[in-house]
Amino acid sequence: MDNKVLVKELITVSILHRCHIMTDASQTGLYFGQPMMLEYILSHPDCTQRELAKALNISPASAATSLGRIEKSGFIARRQDEADSRKNRLSVTESGLKALEAFRAVCDTTDTQLLSGFGEDEREQLFSFLQRLHENLAQNISREDLRKTIKSGGKR
């Protein structure tokens, strides 16, 4: 089989997966990139905007824009740092936690649909194939190049 056919199918599956999640997740009030931010804030309570941006490999300006939208939706709260009034500490609100839980449920449903009809042996075999694909590509790229690509949204 031609490499291009295989790679095109792999990319198509990835796009369909993302499309299903983002379409179904729209009812949660969360949009692309926001769940990742909420997950980080939830696991790093009282983090700063700068810490969040650094951890997610995004610019502070991008973080500020996204956090503004998330805050407007009522999913996070900002609290001024007691030691440094220039910093704001971030926390997930109760409604943010509910939205995140709903988003996780959407992901679980989509993942179940994606892998329906696959037996345990097939899942293990698929995992093995995906690990090999990962290794094939990872060996020729530096961590810094990967970080830059992620930060630029894939644009070079």
Regions found by a protein language model. Give the residues of each.
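Short, locally clustered residues in the helix-turn-helix/winged-helix DNA-binding domain
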Residues: I11, E39-S43, R104, Q131
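Charged, amphipathic alpha-helical coiled-coil/dimerization segments
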Residues: G68-Q131, E135
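C-terminal regulatory/oligomerization modules of transcriptional regulators
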Residues: D121-R156
